[in-house]
């Protein structure tokens, strides 16, 4: 028999009754019922119930062990009997009557319980992450991540992509987030950087003559944490394709996402094909370029309805309406609570009216609406008895943010929100440029390296604020999974694009010398995308925080509490790396 086990703890069934077995695992739980000791033994594969009878050596040994100690047991599989079957366990029809016990590793008193999801704070969980990962939910999340990545690889190969590795030590990048830098021992005063993304290398692979590239790429950014973003390190499905237009990129990625979310979504419906929504339309209808399409409500721009209005709350402002059917009969509390939510999102209040059975409008602002206002709103919003309308007024961006959040919250409260579904969409036609509100200067809106729609002709003849870019995002349930673009592979177009944003040719040639040099040796048209693996798993696991799907994440302050990183270096290491440390002076 094997030194540690003949079977796993998730393997035994009623067909194994009478078999002598050896199991190893963690002491998950212990119960003493009428002098008989019942132990739940857990390993990676499941749980098997052990039974030890009083007066036996096995009973004495198991009775002394602390929870989460590792043990090896020898025993015989017996039937639990019809009255004692546990239908929640695959092994629930049997138990193992223990004859021999060997302690493999004793556990100290636990900082928190493993077999229940108690309210232990995240910092403690991350400090003892090796214990936290023993919990069923966390263990399941990490195994889901493993399966998702394995499936991505096989699906990408089936779609004709080739997996290739790109460097981890590279040059610093002048754009994007802050780099993590690595000092060079051999080249004093010089530094490598960990890649924020393999962006330049994957484009160089296309210029090198490869056609369809992918990798599960580690990326490093020195940025602050959010619920959907882990500080430090994250992983993305990095993709690049040659001789493609936008829809050529969409097709394989849409197929991949549909199949992936159907495979691991536990029956949640995946809407396909994914709608293509222009950026401007998304901002107007949903108040966000990351719309949650499970909310079956849309915003309507009614700014023109109140042009010249004497109603000061709306006059001269951008006004957005949110019509909500079947809520007119809701109590005043419904409207007040939605107003409180709007205030929590930054609004000063939330104006509203409702349509009665007689078709007349009532509510806090009904008296300020003229007959012309009411007629136009009724027509524009298709109002009918039972409807309510919520209004937001102010600057475009402010109203979009607030009313976009109100749209989703109202849908949830009013029963117009789809559950158990993955609603994807593509956001397309991003503006190439925007005007800096403080300086009034033209700057890039999103990705400066994307191809402008219309190419050089657009750059030379259109108002910069009217130029659209071949940029796109893929969004699922309000979570941005990735940005992508058709790349600007023509040096003259790139130089012109940067010139419009205020960069002279000398600066661009210096900062992006490597890419521009490669572009001048016959670069193919190419484009790509990089969906975030962590965010994909977060959605599939239905977790609110990305750190719940990563085995060993940093905390929100970019610290590894388990390993003690970041650490200080001793003076000899600093000298070897030609470094001195200057800590900020306390204020």
Curated annotation (Swiss-Prot):
One of its GO terms (cellular component) is cytoplasm. Keywords: Aminoacyl-tRNA synthetase, ATP-binding, Cytoplasm, Ligase, Nucleotide-binding, Protein biosynthesis. It catalyses: tRNA(Asp) + L-aspartate + ATP = L-aspartyl-tRNA(Asp) + AMP + diphosphate. Coiled coil: none annotated. It holds the Pfam family GAD. ATP binds at residues 221-223, 480, 532-535. L-aspartate binds at residues 175, 221, 446, 487. Its main location: cytoplasm. It is found in: Cytoplasm. GO terms for biological process: aspartyl-tRNA aminoacylation. CDD domains: AspRS_core (cd00777), EcAspRS_like_N (cd04317). Residues 199-202 are annotated as: Aspartate. Its EC number is 6.1.1.12. Signal peptide: none annotated. It is an enzyme of class 6 (ligase). InterPro entries: Aa-tRNA-synt_II, aa-tRNA-synth_II, aa-tRNA-synth_II/BPL/LPL, Asp-tRNA-ligase_1, Asp-tRNA-ligase_1_N, Asp/Asn-tRNA-synth_IIb, AspRS_core, GAD-like_sf. One of its GO terms (molecular function) is ATP binding. Catalyzes the attachment of L-aspartate to tRNA(Asp) in a two-step reaction: L-aspartate is first activated by ATP to form Asp-AMP and then transferred to the acceptor end of tRNA(Asp). Homodimer. Belongs to the class-II aminoacyl-tRNA synthetase family. Type 1 subfamily. This is Aspartate--tRNA ligase. It comes from Streptomyces coelicolor (strain ATCC BAA-471 / A3(2) / M145).
